[in-house]
């Protein structure tokens, strides 16, 4: 590594980064961040896993809806995917205390084993509804560990000044996976059946595992190993409490999971089927349109040379995101609904990337795993939002569900701005 002097060119731990001479140059290439360390392996293992997960979400949502005709149970299959969120703080401590590469490989192997189990049940025609719920719940036990690992591995490999590019690429990958996964998953299910859809999902999980093996080993420092679990958890809570930005950022992580993400994490099957009479392919296309918008928003923020005031971007994006939900709730003609859905996804992509950039910039390297682990509890908002949204859809219809969640999001964003004004001024 070169010994460069500008502060912006250094990692959070003070070590200088590479390619400093290029910092001042602009580039529209979102993949330029792959030159940093082993991020060229961190990103592919995330991408392959996300493609598998997004196919799985749409395939299982359609399967449950057809088997039960219950929007509430569709919401439940999405919600149980995040049951393991409760262990987020513990996983954060694990990430700070153990070799992150070995943890990542272990997560991938476990995911492959579950996918093979479900595929076997499908092929042998022994799959029952409770099997799907049980296997998805088991997978949720490591899903949160996977998320924390990816975020910390990214922050380990990519210097602070380029972090927004990595987060933008990561978010674009998620939304790209939703575009491809929704279309491919829905189409495979319609044309070839549940068995071939899950065989494809299993192959993607296997490829993600192989890529994870290429990540550099990250032995932990001695001082991290000697910190007790309880002490480490208290340190994370104390740091969050004393920081003027983190409480508000963690609140927003819960809010958007509760109000916005349920629409593209299972409930799109209900929206497409009940409001616009779409089949599996049509539902997949609607989810893909929302994700294409989010991909564009995340990519736009990711290719910027620098991102100032990510908190302000997050707040303005949240207002726009939830206001568009009120327009979607009016159930306009399908062509206009898709246009609004694209804009909704675009504002969501910008909002999410800004939030994660602010979180990772604010959390120091030595406590990053603990802070992100505690932050992960906010993802319980998605489980609650899926159940709440599924219940509203069942009782009052999908349009009412979209409007209620959008109204809650707008109100909560306004309250957050009043409660944590530092978010709007953060650099």
What are these regions (language model features)?
Residues 45, 80, 169-177, 252, ...:
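Hydrophobic alpha-helical segments of secondary membrane carriers
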Residues 75-77, 90, 97, 101-113, ...:
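C-terminal transmembrane bundle of multi-pass solute transporters/carriers
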Residues 24-83, 238, 242-290:
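Helix-loop boundary and gating motifs at the non-cytosolic
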Residues 61-68, 119-124, 180-200, 274-275, ...:
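Transmembrane alpha-helix termini and helix-breaking/packing motifs in multi-pass membrane transporters
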Residues 138-150, 344-355:
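Core transmembrane helices of Major Facilitator Superfamily
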Residues 14-27, 213-238, 427:
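Flexible cytoplasmic inter-helical loops of multi-pass small-molecule transporters
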Residues 155-163, 361-368:
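Paired intracellular helix-loop junctions of major facilitator superfamily
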Residues 129-140, 144, 165-220, 288, ...:
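Hydrophobic alpha-helical transmembrane segments
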């Amino acid at each position: 590594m070169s010994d460069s002097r500008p502060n912006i060119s250094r990692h959070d731990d003070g070590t200088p980064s590479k390619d400093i001479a290029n910092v001042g140059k602009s580039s529209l290439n979102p993949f330029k961040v792959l030159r940093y360390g082993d991020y060229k392996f961190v990103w592919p293992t995330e991408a392959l896993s996300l493609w598998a997960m997004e196919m799985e979400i749409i395939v299982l949502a359609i399967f449950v809806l057809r088997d039960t005709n219950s929007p509430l149970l569709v919401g439940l299959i999405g919600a149980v995917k995040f049951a393991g969120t409760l262990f987020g703080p513990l996983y954060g401590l694990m990430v700070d205390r153990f070799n992150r590469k070995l943890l990542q490989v272990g997560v991938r192997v476990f995911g492959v084993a579950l996918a093979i189990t479900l595929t076997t049940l499908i092929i042998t025609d022994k799959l029952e509804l409770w099997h799907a719920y049980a296997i998805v719940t088991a997978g949720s036990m490591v899903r949160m560990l996977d998320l924390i690992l990816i975020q910390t591995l990214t922050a380990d490999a990519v210097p602070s000044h380029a972090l927004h590019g990595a987060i933008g690429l990561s978010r674009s990958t998620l939304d790209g996976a939703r575009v491809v996964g929704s279309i491919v998953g829905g189409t495979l299910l319609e044309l070839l059946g549940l068995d071939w859809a899950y065989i494809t999902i299993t192959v993607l999980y296997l490829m993600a595992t192989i890529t994870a093996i290429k990540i550099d080993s990250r032995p932990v420092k001695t001082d991290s190993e000697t910190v007790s679990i309880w002490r480490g958890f208290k340190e994370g809570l104390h740091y969050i409490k004393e920081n003027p930005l983190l409480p508000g950022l963690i609140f927003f992580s819960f809010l958007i999971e509760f109000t916005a993400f349920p629409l593209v994490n299972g409930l799109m099957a209900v929206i497409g089927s009940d409001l616009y009479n779409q089949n599996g392919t049509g539902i997949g296309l609607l989810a893909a349109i929302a994700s294409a918008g989010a991909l564009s928003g995340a990519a736009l923020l990711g290719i910027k040379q620098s991102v100032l005031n990510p908190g302000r971007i997050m707040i303005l994006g949240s207002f726009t995101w939830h206001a568009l939900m009120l327009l979607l709730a009016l159930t306009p003609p399908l062509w206009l609904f898709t246009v609004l859905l694209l804009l909704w996804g675009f504002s969501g992509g910008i909002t999410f990337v800004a939030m994660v950039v602010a979180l990772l910039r604010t959390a120091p390297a030595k406590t990053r795993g603990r802070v992100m682990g505690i932050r992960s509890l906010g993802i319980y908002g998605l489980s609650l939002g899926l159940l709440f949204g599924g219940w509203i859809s069942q009782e009052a219809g999908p349009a009412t569900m979209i409007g209620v969640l959008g109204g809650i999001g707008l109100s909560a964003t306004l309250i957050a701005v009043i409660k944590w004004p530092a978010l709007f001024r953060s650099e």
